[in-house]
Amino acid sequence: MKRTLLLAFLIAWAAVAGAQDTPDTLVINGVTIIRDNKPVEREPKKGFLKSINTKKSLRNITTEWGMVDIGMSNFVDGTAYAGEAAQAYAPGSNEQWFTTKYFKSRNINVWIVTQRYNLIHHFLNLKYGLGLELNNYRFKNPVRFNPRPATDVVNPPVVSMDETPGRSYRKNKLAADYITIPLMLNFNFTPDRLYPFELSAGVSVGYLYAARNKTITSDEGKLKAKDNFELDPWKLSYVGDLTLGVVTLYGSYAFKSMYKRGLDHTPYNFGIRLRPADFFSKIQN
């Protein structure tokens, strides 16, 4: 009995193994049809490293639209507050007046269009564009910018400290917006890769098209004072960015103070750049 069961088991096992390895056959009107039972090999999915090494076609001129920078705005304060110029612009001021709320002082740049022109083997490129640079400096103290100072004074005061009894501030910021044109040399260390390693450095020229002092207080509510507040209409800055795959970091540092007189505040920005092209390429993949 045991031998019979063992023999039956071996026969059944051999039949199953043979059925797996032997193709199915079917005879119809004398025609033999054979079906292969071998498993179908599927093409492996592209991994992360393989997608990084994917090559792209190279063009002498590449254009990008609608890039957005999101980051921080601030300035280096080199003002001599005891001097005549600072006291004429902001009477009674000191180094504490213009202290900013660091993480609430924000920079947003909207790059309408940027282009890159191949100079040497797509490794060295000329990079340029056109965009809007929006800077917001949030102050800790209730400083107020006067949009219409007295005209009968040669250098009228512009900034004062609000000491109204019982008034509290929810927001107090100076906004300075520029039309900006950057011009940079771009070094692309992986020009034929979809996710590159790039470094760019150069200068930008900005023109002030709008400025305002926005406040929200307990008794006045929301107020906007629009004026140039004797800000320098031109802003020249050192600019640069670093791209690692889909991540781009940017930064800028102005040549000089953003004020024509009184205050020596040299602005700088830094943050991360968002590319719509990277977003849409992820959706398509």
Where are the predicted features?
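Bacterial Sec-dependent N-terminal signal peptides
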Residues: 1-23, 276
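Sec-dependent signal peptide cleavage junction
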Residues: 17-62, 280-285
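Short loop/turn motifs that connect adjacent beta-strands in outer-membrane beta-barrel proteins
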Residues: 54-62, 77-79, 117-124, 190-196, ...
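Residues on the lipid-exposed face of transmembrane beta-strands in outer-membrane beta-barrel proteins
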Residues: 56, 68, 110-116, 130-132, ...
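Outer-envelope beta-barrel architecture signal
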Residues: 60-66, 122-128, 175-179, 193-199, ...
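Transmembrane beta-strands of outer-membrane beta-barrel pores
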Residues: 72-78, 116, 132-138, 203-211, ...
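Extracellular/periplasm-exposed beta-strand and loop segments of Gram-negative cell-envelope proteins
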Residues: 79-85, 93-104, 137-176, 208-218, ...
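Predominantly the C-terminal beta-signal and adjacent terminal strand-loop region
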Residues: 228-285
